[in-house]
């Protein structure tokens, strides 16, 4: 099992309500995008940290492997600036909302001191500007440990602990 980091921003509400992740197969220029292509690597049981508006707001678990699926109706109707291709990658997920969302800026200094070009954060500790990113074990462990200290919901804690077990 793997752990990923998704930047949902403008589509978080729709994806959360629908219990899925969705990304177009091609960007608006008709090219493949590494953040969209990475969706194909999500498999049943993988963990995803959900980032929206500068906060990690949930952890989700993939219910199935990624599959090809047209853009969900609610995303087409959402008031966003994005005009996506209709063909996309879809993963049904179970969201576990963080009662105490984590501001990514709260651990920015740690990320700057522990950079990794293969992770979801740039050298300045900011989330990379792409939809889906890999999350290195070291970065995942740090974020999960911080979140575990804050969360008191037993179900959310259990999911975080399960994700942490993968990082050992």
Q: Which residue stretches match the model-derived regions?
A:
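Compositionally biased, charged N-terminal/linker segments
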Residues: 1-44, 97-102, 106-109, 134-168
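Short, Lys/Arg- and Gly-enriched loop/turn segments at beta-strand edges
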Residues: 55-61
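Short beta-strand or tight-loop elements
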Residues: 44, 58, 89
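Surface-exposed, flexible loop/turn segments at secondary-structure boundaries
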Residues: 11-12, 56, 68
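Aromatic- and Lys/Arg-enriched surface recognition patch
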Residues: 61-137
């Amino acid at each position: 099992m793997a752990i990923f980091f998704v930047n949902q921003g403008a589509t978080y509400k729709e994806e959360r309500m629908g219990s899925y992740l969705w990304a177009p197969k091609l960007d608006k220029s008709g090219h493949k995008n590494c953040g969209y292509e990475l969706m194909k690597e999500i498999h049943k049981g993988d963990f995803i940290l959900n980032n929206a508006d500068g906060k990690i707001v949930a952890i989700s678990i993939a219910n199935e492997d990624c599959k090809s699926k047209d853009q969900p109706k609610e995303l087409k109707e959402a008031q966003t600036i994005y005009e996506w291709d209709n063909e996309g990658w879809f993963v049904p997920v179970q969201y576990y909302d963080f009662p105490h969302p984590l501001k990514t800026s709260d651990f920015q200094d740690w990320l700057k001191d522990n950079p990794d070009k293969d992770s979801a954060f740039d050298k300045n500790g900011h989330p990379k500007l792409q939809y889906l990113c890999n999350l290195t074990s070291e970065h995942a462990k740090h974020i999960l440990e911080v979140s575990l200290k804050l969360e008191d919901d037993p179900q959310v804690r259990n999911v975080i602990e399960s994700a942490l077990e993968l990082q050992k």
